[in-house]
A protein has these predicted regions:
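N-terminal signal peptide c-region/cleavage motif recognized by signal peptidases
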Residues: 13-17
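Conserved serine/cysteine hydrolase catalytic core
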Residues: 43, 228-294
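Conserved HGGG/HGGXW glycine-rich cap/lid loop of the alpha/beta-hydrolase fold
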Residues: 48, 52, 57-107, 327
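Conserved alpha/beta-hydrolase catalytic His-Asp/Glu region
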Residues: 194-256
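An N-terminal hydrophobic leader/cap segment in hydrolases
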Residues: 18-45, 54
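Flexible "cap/lid" loop of the alpha/beta hydrolase fold
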Residues: 150, 154, 163-194
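Catalytic active-site module of serine/aspartate enzymes centered on a nucleophile-bearing elbow/loop
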Residues: 291-336
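Active-site loop/oxyanion-hole signature of alpha/beta-hydrolase fold enzymes
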Residues: 44-50, 57-63, 92, 102-140, ...
């Protein structure tokens, strides 16, 4: 791949905060119009015979630098901006933080044709880090980003100081469990129906155990604004392609092969499971059991440590940022 690095800091404006009950804003296909909490840079490269660009934040320490770097990988229904409070906590303690948007998501390119795989996304991320001068880092992944982080640690173990998984999806193999297959075309049709109301309903039910706080509305508006904007069709198509990737590329069977210090942070009220809506009721009732899945994953990963948040759901860093940040910093402090 041909690589070059273009640093283009965006002018920051007040962060979007529309209520999820209001008509969502209309953002561009690369989330134009939604301001990130720190300057955004662009990593430009060629992949699969096309030019692409990855957006990312590269935030320097505000506290005394400790010489360590943390990479934050977002989930499928999230963006790098969702790590806002985590970034602030990390840089205050002297860490350099990089938070990219993966290809197909948020402010990054959304190709019409791309062979999405976790190996490819890991390679893209690794190349970005090399260009940024990062040779070794702690990798933190949330939701789909947790699946990616696990693949990354398997693919580049020598470059990972720690692996920290925050309610990762992929702690079970849904297809092997019996969840029916869904075509990319069907995923796309489902994605085209996505709006602010459906996003909020899903997150409230699956992520937050039926509860809701006004501060979550901002993230609903961010996601809904992508679908409502002029690039909504391209956004839905990329979401369909990546849903197919997530469903068909399990990582749980490879957990025993991980050879890096690993910590799992598991909100116990999480019930996320890809394709649960297709599963027979009896099967669906067994999927996304994060209290059990977290324990099973910790047992499968050599030397893994489990941090359970009994009263939290899928996004501890959003739901209780101070508690999560304290736990994350404690885990990072155990690095050899």
């Amino acid at each position: 791949m041909r690589h070059c690095l273009l640093l283009a800091a965006l002018t920051l404006s007040p962060l979007a905060s529309a209520s999820a009950t209001d008509a969502p804003p209309r953002y561009g296909a690369q989330l134009e119009g939604f301001a990130y909490p720190y300057p955004v840079h662009w990593y430009r490269f060629d992949s699969q015979r096309q030019p692409l660009q990855m957006a990312y934040m590269d935030v320097a320490p505000t506290g005394t630098p400790n010489g360590r770097t943390v990479v934050l990988l977002h989930g499928k229904n999230f963006c790098a901006a969702t790590w806002e409070s985590t970034i602030a906590a990390l840089v205050a303690q002297g860490y350099r933080v990089l938070a990219p948007d993966q290809i197909g998501f948020c402010k990054s390119s959304k190709p019409q044709a791309y062979q999405f795989s976790f190996a490819q996304l890991a390679a893209n991320t690794h190349a970005l880090l090399q260009q940024a001068g990062v040779t070794r880092a702690a990798i933190v992944g949330h939701s789909m980003g947790g699946m990616l982080a696990a693949h990354y640690a398997l693919q580049y173990p020598q470059d990972v100081s720690q692996l920290l998984l925050v309610n990762p999806i992929g702690l079970e193999d849904w297809k092997a469990a019996g969840v029916p297959w869904r075509s990319v075309d069907d995923w796309y049709a489902k994605e085209r129906k996505t709006d602010a109301a459906s996003i909020k309903q899903y997150q409230q039910t699956v992520y937050y155990g039926g509860q809701w706080k006004p501060e979550y509305d901002r993230w609903v508006s961010m996601q809904a604004g992508l679908y409502a904007g002029p690039g909504g069709d391209r956004v839905a198509w990329n979401q369909a392609l990546t849903s197919d990737m997530v469903f068909n590329q399990p990582v749980v069977q490879r957990f025993p092969q991980l050879r890096v210090p690993t910590t799992l942070f598991i909100g116990q009220r999480d019930r996320t499971a890809i394709g649960k809506d297709l599963a027979p009721p009896a099967l669906a009732a067994t999927l996304g059991d994060y209290p059990a899945l977290g324990k099973r994953a910790a047992a499968a990963i050599p030397g893994a440590r489990l941090v359970a948040f009994d009263d939290l759901g899928h996004s501890p860093q959003v739901e209780a940022p101070q508690r999560f940040n304290t736990a994350l910093l404690e885990a990072l402090g155990t690095a050899p």
